[in-house]
Amino acid sequence: MIHFDQVTYFYPEASRPILDRVSLDIDEGELILVIGPSGSGKSTFLRCLNGMVPHFYGGRFAGQVRVAGLNPVEREPRGMSATVGFVFQDPEAQFVVDTVEDEMAFAMENQGLSQTLMRKRIEEVLDQLSIAHL
């Protein structure tokens, strides 16, 4: 489901890579925890999954990333948003609304989905995850 092959990434103006020849495979349904000290590349690693690295940040990127068969480097982040999402360690700095339902709606509104489809998807996900109370 997620495949990294020799991924190396330098931020602009950096003399050392933040990711250096990272190779790994994560299978569908597998649960992983991305941990490490501040500045170790955790967020950069995650941003490779949705294409924010290198599209938004620039810099030098080498290697291959695949997520559900898609190449985030070849696609724009908008094209990956239906497949990849994540919450950073400080969700207060990331979320723009107060409820899970409104946050889900905000993301789908940005994708241009109809109100009817948004309502259906929100209800399905809230029920599947048993988080309708949030």
Annotate each language-model stretch with its function.
Residues G69, T116-L134:
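Conserved ABC ATPase "signature" region
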Residues I35-P37:
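The feature captures the beta-strand-to-loop junction immediately N-terminal to the Walker
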Residues I26-E28, G79:
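Conserved hydrophobic segment flanking the Walker A/P-loop of ABC-type ATPase nucleotide-binding domains
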Residues G51, Q64-G79, S114:
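ABC ATPase NBD Q-loop/coupling interface
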Residues M1-F4, Y9-R21, V53-G58, E74-E76, ...:
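A short, flexible loop at the N-terminus of ABC-type nucleotide-binding domains that lies
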Residues I32, S43-F56:
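Short, conserved post-Walker A segment of ABC-type ATPase nucleotide-binding domains
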